[in-house]
Structures are given as structure tokens and as C-alpha cells.
Amino acid sequence: MIYVDADACPVKPEILKVAERHGLEVTFVANSGLRPSRDPMVRNVIVSAGFDAADDWIAERAKDGDIVVTADVPLAVRCVGAGALVTGPTGRVFDETNIGMASAMRDLSAHLRETGESKGYNAALTSRDRSAFLETLDRLCRRVKR
């Protein structure tokens, strides 16, 4: 199973492509509108607009043998702790060896934004990022199928 934190996820088409190739189910979870899919391997879940509702839904279900796609570091922390394989939309893998540092960097960035030291702009996703994501997701899919 691939769980996707789908609000503002820029790699949905890539996820569908890789999941289809590997025969894995995909669940897109969001607070609002998702495009319907006729594919029986794709499920859309709309959660309440509450704070972290999509994150909570995914974190309550993700387990060993699942893949989670998210750019949200706190969600990644929870899913890594549950044994899931986690990647961001740029192909960055979050695991037990780097999730602590990712969380610390997120907290530092939030502090810098609050103090006005940083504007907090996120770079646009590049074609190189998309390629790295495709490679990472393909590798994670092969790993869960073993």
C-alpha cells in the first residue's frame, strides 16, 4: 500500500505510474478535492478540514510494509516510527538514520521564520527532483514486494 499526503502533492501522476507498474494500491488522503479515479487500485479519502486530519489518518494506518509519500516532516516521523518506508516528493528518503536531523532542521526553519530571519520560501519542484522521486519510489516498491 502507498499512502499519499495528497494536499499539494506535486507528484501524483508519478505515484500512479510507479504503483501501476508494481501492482500496488494507492490511497490519496486530503482535506479537499481529489480527482476521481476509475482505477480499482486507487482510493481517495477526504478527511475533515481539521488541523493535521490527513496526517492523523495516514499515521494511524501506515505500518511496516507500507510506503508513505509526504513532504510533512512530523508525519514522516510518525510513519518511520511505525515501520513504514517514507519518501518526500523530491525523492528524499526519511528513515531512522536521518529523521531526527530532518525534524531538528524543520524546527530550526520554523524558528527562523517566526523571528523573521527567513522568508521560508520552498523551491519549485524541478525535473531532476521528479526523476529522483521516480527512482526512489520504484526502489521502495521493489523493497516492499520482496
UniProtKB/Swiss-Prot annotation:
Name of a matching Pfam family: DUF188
CDD domains: PIN_YqxD-like
InterPro entries, per the entry: UPF0178 (IPR003791)
PANTHER family documented for this protein: UPF0178 PROTEIN YAII
Family membership noted in the UniProt record: Belongs to the UPF0178 family.
Protein name: UPF0178 protein R01393
Classification of source organism: Bacteria, Pseudomonadati, Pseudomonadota, Alphaproteobacteria, Hyphomicrobiales
